[in-house]
């Protein structure tokens, strides 16, 4: 089976392409699609992804597509209309690719969406049956892409699988998770000890394994799955487990949650506060029931792999980018 992987040079894309090199996946050949040359074996440079991208060369002979490429951020103050920027890549770019897949005979399209389509925070675990409630431009663009893909699937027979992962961590992670990892590794006291929430995350190895299952399982076609590790944890528990993986003490200070929330608001870090203070968990029953899939790695195993990568990164620094 020949598989096109978009966003192949990104955090998840690199892990997925590495997985295809393992012996058990020898039946697959991959076409890593990248925006600019990255030196990946067999890569296809497609340039900017939007509603006009020419995918014909990349899709030649391809049986399935894993669509990871997305716009995740826009520079504050530099984009007058963030929603238009997100839609250009995440909605129009996705649907244009799907239509070209239909035209070239691609059978299956695995779309990596986001748990943010469901919402930002909720005490109860999210399920696939919940009505989507995207709260920002990124999440809305992903939700609109999902709706468009379902319409294309209904009209053409393209086998669409939609995956909504929770926060992804693992070797190569960046952004807020890396900042928290660095703080724990450096022994910074963290005022998070009084937080009582539940957060679902997913180790990149588990996400890759789920993608591979969805590529080949007949029952995956037409389904949407929420993805996470097997357990949700509170923010203080995550810090403790992270510290254990790093071989460091967890230096937690218990400050009142309302005080933390107020401080985050003053610092214009409300989005970060939601991720640290509030709950967001998912019920993974559907993918277990329909595909027989369970995460092969535990949270602690994922954190140990991440900690080992971080230690090696400190020993021989290498710039990590979020570009796909």
Where is each model-derived feature located?
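N-terminal Rossmann NAD(P)H-binding glycine-rich loop of SDR-like oxidoreductase domains
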Residues: 3-26
């Amino acid at each position: 089976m020949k598989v096109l992987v978009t966003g192949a040079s990104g955090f998840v894309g690199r892990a997925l392409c590495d997985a295809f090199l393992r012996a058990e996946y020898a039946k697959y050949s991959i076409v890593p699609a990248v925006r600019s040359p990255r030196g990946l074996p067999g890569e296809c440079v497609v340039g900017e992804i939007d509603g006009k991208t020419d995918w014909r060369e990349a899709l030649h002979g391809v049986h399935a597509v894993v669509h990871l490429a997305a716009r995740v951020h826009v520079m504050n103050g530099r984009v007058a209309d963030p929603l238009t920027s997100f839609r250009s890549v995440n909605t129009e770019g996705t649907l244009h690719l799907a239509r070209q897949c239909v035209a070239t005979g691609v059978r299956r399209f695995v779309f990596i969406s986001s748990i943010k389509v469901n919402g930002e925070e909720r005490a109860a675990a999210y399920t696939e049956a919940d009505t989507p409630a995207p709260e920002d431009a990124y999440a809305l663009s992903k939700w609109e892409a999902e709706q468009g893909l379902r319409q294309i699937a209904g009209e053409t027979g393209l086998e669409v699988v939609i995956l909504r992962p929770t926060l992804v961590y693992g070797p190569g992670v960046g952004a807020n998770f890396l900042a928290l990892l660095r703080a724990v590794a450096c022994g910074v006291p963290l005022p998070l000890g009084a937080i009582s929430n539940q957060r679902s995350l997913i180790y990149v190895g588990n996400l890759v394994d789920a993608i591979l299952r969805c590529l080949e399982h007949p029952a995956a076609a037409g389904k949407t799955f929420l993805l996470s590790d097997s357990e949700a944890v509170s923010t203080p528990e995550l810090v403790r487990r992270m510290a254990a993986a790093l071989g460091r003490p967890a230096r937690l200070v218990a400050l009142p949650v309302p005080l933390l929330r107020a401080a985050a608001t003053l610092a214009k870090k409300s989005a970060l506060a939601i991720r640290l203070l509030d709950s967001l968990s998912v019920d993974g029953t559907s993918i277990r029931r329909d595909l027989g899939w369970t995460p092969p790695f535990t949270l602690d195993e994922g954190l140990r792999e991440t900690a080992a990568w971080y230690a090696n990164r400190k020993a021989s620094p290498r710039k990590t980018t979020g570009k796909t």
